Design a protein with these regions (language model features):
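Conserved G1/Walker A P-loop phosphate-binding module
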Residues: 1-68, 78-80, 84, 106
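Conserved C-terminal guanine-recognition region of P-loop GTPase G domains, centered on the G4
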Residues: 43-49, 72-140
């Protein structure tokens, strides 16, 4: 069975841990304030003939700053060289999410974007065209 390393990256409170829990069946604590995921969390799941090792990186707004969370996220991506990065974008604060997403794309690793918090965005009157965003970023 093939095994690949995948990381979830995104700003605090964008739903990374919820996605991680859904995919891995883990029960990582999810709270509604920044800094909950200070350390990376790991789990796995099987998709077809592939075992996906999934790592939930600490929430961060940028890879350029020097907070412990930002350093841990950048260091993990550089040193562990994941097969793919899942950039979890908060649709309700898309501009902030895109800043980190663009930095992740600059690292030249296979990356895909997941729009999360669409319900929150809709309640705020925010509409996101996922297809146009995907085309603009050049990633699925």
């Amino acid at each position: 069975m093939e095994q690949i390393l995948t990381v979830l990256a995104g700003q605090p409170n964008c739903g990374k841990s919820t996605i991680f829990n859904m995919l891995t069946g883990a029960r990582q604590y999810v709270a509604n304030y920044p800094g909950v995921t200070v350390e990376k969390k790991a789990g796995s799941f099987v998709c077809g003939d592939t075992r996906v090792e999934l790592v939930d990186l600490p929430g961060t707004y940028s890879l350029a700053s020097w907070s412990p969370e930002e350093m841990a996220a950048r260091q993990f991506i550089v040193e562990e060289d994941p097969a793919q990065i899942v950039a979890v974008l908060d649709a309700s604060t898309l501009e902030k999410s895109l800043y980190l997403c663009l930095q992740l794309l600059e690292m030249r690793r296979p990356t895909l974007a997941v729009l999360n918090m669409m319900d929150v965005a809709a309640k705020r009157g925010i509409r996101v065209d996922a297809d146009a965003l995907s085309q603009a970023l050049g990633i699925p």
